[in-house]
Structures are given as structure tokens and as C-alpha cells.
From Swiss-Prot:
Name of the protein: COP9 signalosome complex subunit 5
EC number(s) recorded for this UniProt protein: 3.4.-.-
Function (record text): Catalytic component of the COP9 signalosome (CSN) complex that acts as an regulator of the ubiquitin (Ubl) conjugation pathway by mediating the deneddylation of the cullin subunit of SCF-type E3 ubiquitin-protein ligase complexes. The CSN complex is involved in the regulation of the mating pheromone response.
Enzyme class: hydrolase
Segments traversing the membrane: none
Any matching Pfam family: JAB
Organism (species): Eremothecium gossypii (strain ATCC 10895 / CBS 109.51 / FGSC 9923 / NRRL Y-1056) (Yeast)
Entry's localization field: Cytoplasm; Nucleus
PANTHER family: EUKARYOTIC TRANSLATION INITIATION FACTOR 3 -RELATED
Amino acid sequence: MDTPSAALHRHTVGQLRKLLLHREGSAGCGRLQPALDGSQPLDSPLSTVPSSRSQVRVQQELWKQDPTYFQKAALSALACMKILRHAFDGGDMEVLGMLLGYVQDEMIVVVDSYRLPVEGTETRVNAQMESYEYTVQYLETAVPEGLAIVGWYHSHPGYGCWLSGIDAETQTLNQNFQDPYLAIVVDPKRSKASGVIDIGAFRTMPETADTRSVSSHSNASRYGHHSARYYELEVSYFEVPQERRWCDSRLSVEPPKPADATERAMLAQLLEAAKACKNVKRLQTVDRALVPESIGPYALREQADQDLQFRRPLRSFSSNSIARRSSTEVALGNANEELDPLPTLADANLRNHDSPSADMAMDNTSISSNEEQPHLTFQESSGVQLNAAETEYFDIKNELLTLKLLEYQKARFYRDAFTL
């Protein structure tokens, strides 16, 4: 079974747009349900930078006069998909991140989002000092001019979109410190089960009688025991023209594959070539240990001459004895020749081997064979084998490195082009 993160990665950008739907139901508290399948265009009255009129409204701080001044929250397709992917990556653990955007009239516009390094459990997420340091560094280096932090988001894996007591307290502190501020909650498990994104946007209110009476009409079972402390905003989605053209384009890049049959075959060939090099080097080491390097063709010739001097008296003695035996047995030999005029092949070979000239020929043949096959010939042949094995090894290695480099380039391009 695929994990939620793996299932999300298989979707194209156009298919991910279909996930930007609200959950169905009549008790939507004024939620919008825009169609994102292309038959009905998205609401696109917004841009990625605030207007001058919006900046004037921010300076007036009208939300301080009306606790429920903000009634709408607009999320860009980019921010929404990044939030959803972060929640999917977290799995059963809660995740947390920050929202970037601006204020337009009574609507908080969320243009982008980014993750925070936090400690999360199944029911709680804690931001440590490292998270605040990361937030400051991110604002100084990666946030475009005109955008600011307009809220935070976290996930509720499997138990709906609402604010707990700790969530409401955190939102109240942030609203008092850096208002306008928005809290977004997303449920990745329900989003995957229903096929539409389950998300909610909330703001807290001062604890007054009027707000308590208004919030008492909400469903406490849905929004929790602290539903009187906050209210929900309408959520809509928008796309900037650049995002729409990119989603409608026919750009298609397949994710790079980590390994295939070709790579496995090349790895096997590389191991075989390495073993061949090792075996040739081992044979060279054994041969040098058995035959000293000082033995060469001249040393072999001297050794053969010494053997020849020791063998010659013995060979002459054997020939003289054969001559004496032939003089006493000549009659018997003549009789045998009359019976069998043709000598046998064995007798001819025996006479040839017993002759002194044959002895000299054999000695010369043994000396010449020793001269033609010195120890250096084996070294040269083993050196040729080693060079061939090393050449094959380095060729396969370079081809494999080239293949991995191309795979890295594809992975880098895919990450730069499609990472949200």
C-alpha cells in the first residue's frame, strides 16, 4: 500500500488542483466550494504582492475595533499544496509551519508557506528556540519584499480541523503580539480518504459576552470545548496567472528512477573486472616468490652446459659397450636380418636414441627450449592481462559514473522544477 506522500508525488500539478476543495456538508459555516477541475475558473482577484490600498488599511488597524473584522482567508494554490504535502510527510505526527502573505480589506491573503523544525507527537507539536531562529533567518533571506508572516498552520492527523485549548491560547498570544494573524488547521488523513482537502482557518476573539453569545450557536462537538474562544473564516483559493499557465502547460517530466536493470548489470560487470585484476596480481606475486628474478636466459644456458658436460661420458660409455656387443653377435644379427629384412619402427627409434648425435640434438633442443621460454615471457603476458583487466574495469567504472551523473542531473532538475 502506498503512503500518502508517495500517492501525492504521483499526482501531476493539474490533478493536485482538484484536491483544493472543501469538505462536503451543510454545516460548513459559510465555506466556499469552488470547482477546480477547469470547468469553472478559480477566483483570481489577487496577486502575490499587496496593493497600496491594502497597506493603508493595515496602517489603520481596523481589526482592533471589530474582533470579527476578518471574515475571509484566501490561500494560493502554491501555499495550499505545500501545506498539504507537509502534512502528508508528517504522517501520524503533527507538523507546524508559517504562513506568508498580506491583508486585503477584510481578507487575509496567504501567498506562500514554509515548514518549521519542531518536535511533534500524535496530538501535540512544540516549537523550540531553533524554530524561532529559523523563522528570523527565513524572513531575512527568503521572503520577497511586501510579504510578511500572517499566521501559522499545523496538522490534526485524523481528528478534524478545530482549535484545542493550547491552539487557541497560542493564537491569542500571536494576535496580541503581531496581528493580523491567522491559524490554519489541516487534516491529511481525512483529505486522503475523501479526495478533497480538509482545511480550516480560525481566529480567536476576546472573551466578552457578545462573542460568547455569537459563538454559542456553533457546534461544540465539532469545534471542541473551546469553540467559544474562536471563530472560523471562509476559505477560498486563487491562482496567479503564472501558476495557471504553468498548470495548463504540457510540460511533462517523469521522476528519475533510482536504479534499473542496466545499472545492476554494470555493477556486476564492475565487480567481475575487479576480481579479474585481483587474480592477475595474485598470480604475479606467487610467480615472483617461486622463481627468483636473477634467473634469466644466460643463467639457464650455463646450467644447460654444465648438465651436458656431466652427461657426455655416460653417453660415450654406453655407445662403446653397444659396439662390443654388436661384434660378438653379428652372426645372429645377420640371421635375423634374413628372416626379417625390414627393421621395425621400435628398433629404428632405439638406434636413433642410442646414437651420440641424437644425444647432442636432445641437449641442444633442451637448451633452446629453455632459452625461448624465460621467466620474463610470463611477466610480459601477465602484464598484458593485467592491463586489459584494468582497462575494462576503468571503462565500466567511467560509464557507471556517467550514468549516475545523468541521473543526478535529472533528479536535480526535477527537484528544482516541481518541488513546492
